[in-house]
């Protein structure tokens, strides 16, 4: 197990070195605790008083663990149209060995298409990827 402070310091260094304007990370609303720790480390590493860099922070939707929480659910507020990239997304997910099962599993090909269509319906496009904007400095 890696100490939380070590994770945070590594992220701080990468943010300072790379100077990103957007960081996409996990969400705190997850059953996968590694994802929650990742989100918290990014949150700490990019706190406004620490960093000269003020990147926008988005949390991505994980097709499974973000849907299986009992108390809270992932609520997106940013959508990216992916109609031109849906085939590439499916191909990329197919390389994620051991994480795909038959539908109705969310990470099956049919599950991923269903989620993309649902997020598309929410945002008025054919297919969309959903995110949660946690911080943006304009």
Name what the model sees in each region:
Residues 1-138:
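Metal-dependent de-N-acetylase/amidase catalytic core
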